[in-house]
Regions:
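One-carbon transfer enzymes
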Residues: 1-240, 246, 275, 279-280, ...
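A conserved acidic, glycine/proline-rich C-terminal tail/linker
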Residues: 256-278
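Short, structured protein-protein interaction patches enriched in aromatics and acidic/basic residues
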Residues: 242-255
Length: 305
């Protein structure tokens, strides 16, 4: 396989995918990634450096002037190298048209949600799928365009979102599926033996999420709160609430009970604290057991939004 391939990535799943492809004798000629300072500047959740992998396999890295690849130096880089194929491996920005036009074959994008594209385009689909309590995820590989996840679909696979999953475990599953599908797809694309499935139907879009969106609304069922917390736990900034104007980060929780009731207590009130430090919060329906958190809590205190 003599084609020149570049991977754009800056997350753990991208690192894992790249190493897997190399071990399966897929030659990656260049990496486009971010350094730690750039990742902080552009608020990249789940950032992972490609530097060790670059040194291990002697693959050069280009650190762009812009995460959006919209600076002259970035275009110059792609024009100079004239890659055949670009693969995304954890790159949370659209690739500009002038970059895509430098590619001889094209670019492979990766996107997923609980529905087939064009449903579920946009930002943070893993988080939104968990928040919405979905029980499946469809990872789709598509031919990149400058638009938002609107290229022809090249391949896809459905997997479960079970009741124990968090955003991290869903990303583990994405990593497994992404590796397998890319290994199958790359040789077909190089040989021009791939099928394209146009997207049909009315698109829907997920909006961007920010750290401020992690504020907990306790006036919900314990099941809804569980979904919310597991959707934005590590490696994301996490769910949070306030006690006496102090922010408390909540990383892990689960529904406690619907039959042990706390009718005399207010919604958001801490109704139990156990010797382990775990505590129970009264919810609109049921109660929530919090088992991993940052901060100090006190019995009978009430969380505020």
């Amino acid at each position: 396989m003599n084609s020149k391939i570049v991977m754009c990535g800056c997350t753990e799943s991208g690192v894992e995918t790249l190493e897997f492809l190399i071990e399966q004798n897929i030659t990656i000629n260049y990496i486009v990634s971010l350094d730690e300072e750039q990742a902080k500047k552009w608020n990249v959740s789940g950032y992972c450096s490609f530097e060790k992998l670059s040194k291990k396999y002697n693959i050069p890295i280009y650190y762009p002037e812009s995460y959006s690849l919209n600076q002259k130096e970035d275009l110059d880089f792609f024009q100079h190298h004239s890659f055949d194929l670009l693969i995304l491996g954890g790159w949370q920005r659209l690739i500009p048209d002038n970059i895509l036009s430098t590619l001889k074959i094209g670019g492979i994008g990766v996107h997923g949600s609980s529905e087939m594209l064009p449903k579920g385009r946009g930002r943070s689909p893993v988080n939104w799928s968990l928040i919405e309590g979905k029980n499946r995820y469809i990872l789709q590989l598509f031919l990149m365009t400058p638009g938002i996840d609107d290229g022809d679909i090249l391949d896809f696979q459905t997997f479960d979102i079970n009741k124990w999953d968090t955003c991290r475990t869903v990303y583990y599953k994405i990593s497994v599926v992404q590796k397998r599908k890319l290994l199958e797809l790359i040789p077909k694309i190089i040989k021009n033996e791939f099928k394209r499935i146009p997207q049909t139907g009315e698109p829907t879009f997920y909006p961007k999420r920010t750290p401020d969106d992690g504020l907990i609304n306790w006036n919900q069922t314990s099941e809804k709160l569980y979904d919310f917390i597991r959707a934005i736990t590590k490696p994301y900034p996490g769910a949070f609430s306030y006690l006496d104007n102090k922010k408390i980060k909540i990383w892990k929780a689960q529904p406690f009970d619907n039959k042990i009731t706390y009718d005399q207590n207010k919604v958001g009130q801490i109704v139990e604290i156990f010797s382990s430090g775990d505590f129970v919060v009264n919810c609109y329906t049921g109660s929530l057991l919090v088992t991993e958190y940052d901060g100090t809590v006190s019995l009978s205190k009430i969380f505020t939004s």
